[in-house]
Design a protein with these regions (language model features):
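N-terminal low-complexity, Pro/Thr/Ser-rich intrinsically disordered segments
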Residues: 1-4
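Juxtacatalytic substrate-recognition/specificity segment
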Residues: 6-127, 144, 221-228
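Acidic/His/Gly-enriched intrinsically disordered linker/tail segments
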Residues: 79-96, 107, 125-262
């Protein structure tokens, strides 16, 4: 990989990370220190849910520009599709690693927190909505300014109407399957918003929520929720969207699900 990117990319390392980038020594050290600091915090937050896999250190790739970044991540999407833009991605294929395009450190920090959360949850077969909900809420816990109304894509008064216009009995199935997180329309942002909200609601009873996360599966259609949370998944969506046919129907998408980790 280093050879393919060219001589201006180099590997630097810390106690728990290997970083491939074109950064000078000092900026590379700052990135690694940031990764180490966030790893400690996220481990504390996730507790026993965070199980680290692999034969060694976490691998982080910081690409010099967006072109290099998208050229790389395109290898992990099906050919011929159109997908939402992204600022980082955890890639589970092969030796799990996460990738980000180079930006100012203030912009990279929350992306690193988000993708590192995915990294620490990679052993769990959880659905995309839960994977992303946990990652976004972890990111917002560490960087609360990102949860402020001024940092959102839409004005607060617009969000309920946009949800109401987008979600119905059919489109909600793309949320449960994870496909809506890859949408190039409003479905992308609305999926993340819905995921973070219903994940936060489910986490209200922390012991029950942790048991749910440990047992949830991409295609169980809410079995783990009924068992550990004590209510069906659609009740969480109902609390955000109001009345509707929100129940997951895994028979419609069980063979075509996304893990999250976007």
């Amino acid at each position: 990989m280093n050879q393919q990117l060219g001589d201006h990319y180099a590997v630097t390392e810390s106690a728990d990370f290997l970083l491939l980038s074109n950064l000078e020594a000092r900026p590379a050290t700052v990135v690694l220190q940031t990764c180490q600091r966030m790893l400690a915090r996220i481990r504390r937050n996730l507790g026993a849910l965070a199980v680290e896999q692999g034969m060694g250190k976490h691998v982080v790739i910081v690409f010099a520009d967006d072109d290099d970044y998208y050229a790389y991540v395109s290898n992990y999407y099906p050919e011929g599709g159109e997908y939402a833009m992204s600022s980082g991605m955890f890639i589970r294929a092969g030796y799990g690693h996460f990738v980000v395009p180079l930006a100012i450190m203030d912009a990279m920090e929350p992306v690193i927190a988000h993708e590192l959360t995915h990294c620490l949850l990679q052993h769990l077969p959880i659905p995309a909505w839960l994977n992303e909900g946990l990652a976004v809420n972890t990111e917002h816990t560490m960087f609360p300014q990102l949860a402020m109304p001024s940092a959102q894509k839409y004005f607060q008064h617009e969000i309920p109407a946009r949800h109401a216009a987008y979600w119905n009995a059919d489109s909600i199935q793309t949320f449960w399957s994870g496909k809506s997180f890859l949408a190039t329309d409003d479905g992308n942002a609305l999926s993340y918003d819905l995921a973070k909200k219903i994940t936060a609601l489910a986490a209200g009873d922390e012991p029950a929520f942790r048991a749910f996360v440990a047992e949830a599966s991409m295609d169980d259609g809410g079995v783990a929720a009924a068992q550990h949370l004590g209510y069906p998944l659609e009740r969480l969506v109902q609390a955000v969207l109001g009345e509707g046919d929100w129940s997951p129907k895994p028979e419609r998408w069980r063979r075509d699900v996304e893990r999250g980790q976007f």
